[in-house]
UniProtKB/Swiss-Prot annotation:
Keywords in alphabetical order: Chaperone, Cytoplasm, Nickel insertion
Signal peptide start-end: none
GO terms for MF: nickel cation binding
Entry keyword annotation includes ATP-binding: no
General function of this protein: Required for maturation of urease via the functional incorporation of the urease nickel metallocenter.
Family classification: Belongs to the UreF family.
Gene3D superfamilies for the chain: Urease accessory protein UreF
GO cellular component: cytoplasm
Organism: Cupriavidus metallidurans (strain ATCC 43123 / DSM 2839 / NBRC 102507 / CH34)
Localisation per UniProt entry: Cytoplasm
Protein name, UniProt field: Urease accessory protein UreF
Cross-referenced PANTHER family: UREASE ACCESSORY PROTEIN F
Quaternary context: UreD, UreF and UreG form a complex that acts as a GTP-hydrolysis-dependent molecular chaperone, activating the urease apoprotein by helping to assemble the nickel containing metallocenter of UreC. The UreE protein probably delivers the nickel.
Amino acid sequence: MTALPQLISLLHLASPALPIGGFSYSQGLEAAIDCELVRDATTAERWIRDNLLHVQAQCEAPVWLLLHRAWQTQDHASVRQWNDWFHATRETSELRLETEQMGWSLAKLIAQMGWGDDASRDLLRDMRPVCLPTAFSSACVALGIAAREGLAAYLFNWAENQVAAAIKAVPLGQVAGQQMLLGLHQAVLGTVDEAVCRADAVPPLLSTFSPMLGVLSARHETQYSRLFRS
């Protein structure tokens, strides 16, 4: 069980109040709404769950774990490798800019808060770009947060942002949003388990195959009316 000081740090990192701009992105959800693939609470929850289990679980979540391990062992070459690999898998300019902006904002906050050792903060400062999984996993290691707990918080924060985007863009009520979040608890846990298995494999079992998400993200770049930056 996570010790209370680490739990407080974890809640801090996963808070929607963390000033990294997650509220301004929908990661293709707004385009899915525009195309009427998402129309109500049921289709919104299905979209978010499928994204967790078939996109996050196969790429971003296992890469997050690999980055956490690299930060723990101070393997800075592997940190750079997985940061660059993840950045290369972002299929559209919107998705690249999203992880760049949020990663840079969190890296800046880490420096200002003095989290971690000098070498780790210097590496975050020098990497261009620094992706969000890289910065978030670094903060977890700096604050003594274990990999599974840190990844669960990362994924729940992602799901929370998706639900908030659905509430605004579908639109949905606040109670419907909370019901969706409750329904996603098991999907978050399942994604963590799948990510651990994929990260533990030799070589890691990673897949970036998500063509519909890539197409919707590209469509969103020229969508006539938008609330979100992705």
